Amino acid sequence: MNLVVGMTWDGVNDSPALRRADVGFAMGSGTEAARDAGDIVILDDNFRSIKDAILYGRTIYNNILKFCRFQLVINIAAVVVSAFAPFFGIMEPLRVTHLLFINLVMDSLGAIMLGNEPAHESYMHEKPRRRDASIISPAMAAQILWMGTWLVLLSFAFLTQPIFAACFAGQAEQYTAYFLLFVLASLMNGFNVRSSGFGIFRDLGANPGFLRVWGGIVLIMAAIINAPLLPNEIGAWIGAMFSCTPIHPGGWVLAFLLAATMLPVDLLRKALVRALR
């Protein structure tokens, strides 16, 4: 079956099984032969310790998957938009510095944001995974493609439709707003990947770093966009480096509202998946 097998007990006759298992859990009060054969010694002789170890191992694994879903949506959308934008007469909607910010800042802070998600007892009801099972499951791939496609469609609609262009004073302001929209949409998707169900806001208090990082990235974006307003050369340098110009409050509201569509779109996908089961 190619599954990872754990074995536990404390007797001399259990030593061969403890040794052959992928992970042998020997009881602390067991025989010396059993303790020598085991990989891990349970000092409190409590089966709950084994259960907790499995739970937190699965939590780490699921948090890695959450980050992968979060980051792959960003990368797919950024690549597709950058590659196909010239065919629509759009030159560099995401500058090199924008892509560096998205990959460096969003990568590192996104790992902190999702890496500390709390353990859920539901993880213990998951089926065992084969050794050769792909990290990206069909369900995970479907979510990545669904949300990546929506972010791409949202991007091209924002960049090509006159109704959005009319909201800004010029192309520079519109492209700055698009950079903001892309980052905010990615952050909104961070809520989506927290849960495979509908409880995307559940247990936010158990991971205070999530909202801190979320708010921190928004503040960093505000600092970058409004840097040219500073009465010194540093502000002008930051604005030139990121090709950003200050946008009016209405532009911020529009970017937030469009980015927030990431939430109902993924909830719709989850509802369809549940209905088709």
Summary of predicted features, one role per range:
Residues 120-123, 192-202, 229-239, 272:
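Juxtamembrane/interfacial segments flanking transmembrane helices
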Residues 186-190, 225, 262-270:
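Alpha-helical transmembrane segments
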Residues 1-13, 19-22, 64, 86, ...:
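Cytosolic catalytic headpiece
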Residues 178-181, 212-217, 255:
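Hydrophobic mid-bilayer segments of alpha-helices in multi-pass membrane transport proteins
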Residues 1-6, 21, 28-198:
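Membrane-embedded transport module
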Residues 202-211:
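Cytoplasmic-side transmembrane-helix entry/capping segments in multi-pass membrane proteins
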Residues 154-158, 217-235:
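Hydrophobic alpha-helical transmembrane segments in multi-pass integral membrane proteins
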Residues 15-16, 32:
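Alpha-helical segments flanking ligand/cofactor-binding loops in enzyme cores
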